[in-house]
């Protein structure tokens, strides 16, 4: 990606160098369930059980439940690579602010910017305590997205998803959940899922996740239009990321077969489809994941 001269967002809390207390009620954000499965797979554990446990603890919505604990200082110097990745993340967040502010204004709405929290290990949130083990996540309780930047290393080593635009896709997806919150979609889905059995709740979760993928594509469309940010190979990076985090892809890799009723983020084909649809159209009205039949997803 070409980010030369791009501003960095000021809506960032840098909690790196601080560590939370005991772990409690971990929830999964985008890729979090899949990372849990990948870690289990590469360590000889049961990936499907690990993924389902993470999903059940979280509800598949990228929010956290748990008990807040003390936070302690653990200062250290960060490497040049770590600092560059932090800078990159704040530039991507700034890009989402610019794009979504304009889109909301076009629809006579006001975009309330989220805050991005950078942390290491564990941190407190309004939704409970978050853990780096479960990847990036969005907490609607405080309208913040939480990222331990070491997750991007995990993406590369465990899932084979690498490249700056792949990382940007992850951030834009979490911002997509914030857009869902601001428009009331997330709350409505939460309420409905609470009354559903697990299989139906999984299906609802898939629609939320695919919509966030679509919104990530919409952001990329307009960010490139505004700033000329995309370079050769960038789109392929994001498409590859969407493919390797598909529920079916990871389950087949881990177990040799997939269990469709357990899918809660969408198949590789679905995730690539909705990201590409957002990228190609840039039109938020095309994000009709809650209006499609299951076969149309």
Give the label of every model feature segment:
Residues 38, 100, 147, 165, ...:
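Active-site recognition of the HExxH zinc-binding catalytic motif
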Residues 1-77:
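Long amphipathic alpha-helical segments used for membrane anchoring, targeting, substrate engagement
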Residues 122-148:
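Catalytic zinc-binding patch centered on the HExxH motif and its immediate surroundings
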Residues 175-190, 223-224:
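Catalytic Zn2+-binding segment of zinc metalloproteases
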Residues 243-297:
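Pan-zinc metallopeptidase signature
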Residues 50-128:
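A metal-dependent hydrolase signature that marks the N-terminal structural subdomain at the beginning
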Residues 151-170, 200-206:
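Short pre-active-site segment immediately N-terminal to the catalytic Zn-binding motif
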Residues 83, 87-111, 200-203, 207-250:
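Short helix/loop segments within enzyme catalytic domains
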């Amino acid at each position: 990606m070409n980010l030369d001269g791009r501003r960095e967002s000021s809506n960032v809390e840098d909690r790196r160098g601080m560590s939370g207390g005991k772990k409690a009620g971990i929830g999964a954000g985008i890729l979090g369930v899949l990372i849990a499965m990948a870690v289990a797979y590469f360590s000889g554990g049961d990936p499907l059980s690990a993924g389902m446990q993470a999903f059940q603890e979280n509800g598949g919505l990228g929010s956290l439940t748990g008990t807040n604990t003390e936070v302690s200082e653990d200062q250290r110097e960060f490497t040049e690579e770590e600092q560059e990745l932090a800078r990159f993340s704040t530039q991507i967040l700034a890009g989402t602010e610019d794009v979504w502010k304009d889109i909301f204004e076009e629809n006579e709405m006001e975009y309330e910017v989220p805050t991005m929290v950078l942390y290491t290990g564990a941190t407190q949130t309004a939704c409970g305590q978050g853990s780096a083990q479960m990847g990036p996540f969005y907490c609607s309780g405080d309208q913040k997205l939480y990222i331990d930047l070491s997750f991007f290393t995990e993406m590369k080593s465990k899932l084979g998803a690498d490249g700056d635009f792949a990382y940007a896709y992850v951030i834009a997806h979490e911002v997509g959940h914030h857009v869902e919150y601001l428009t009331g979609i997330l709350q409505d889905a939460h309420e409905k899922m609470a009354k559903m059995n697990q299989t139906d709740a999984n299906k609802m979760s898939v629609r939320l996740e695919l919509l966030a993928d679509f919104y990530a594509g919409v952001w990329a469309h307009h960010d490139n239009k505004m700033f000329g940010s995309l370079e050769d190979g960038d789109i392929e990076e994001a498409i590859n990321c969407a493919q390797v985090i598909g529920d079916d892809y990871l389950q087949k890799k881990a177990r040799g077969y997939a269990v469709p009723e357990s899918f809660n983020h969408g198949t590789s084909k679905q995730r690539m489809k909705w990201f590409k649809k957002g990228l190609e159209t840039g039109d938020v009205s095309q994000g009709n994941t809650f209006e499609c039949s299951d076969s149309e997803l």
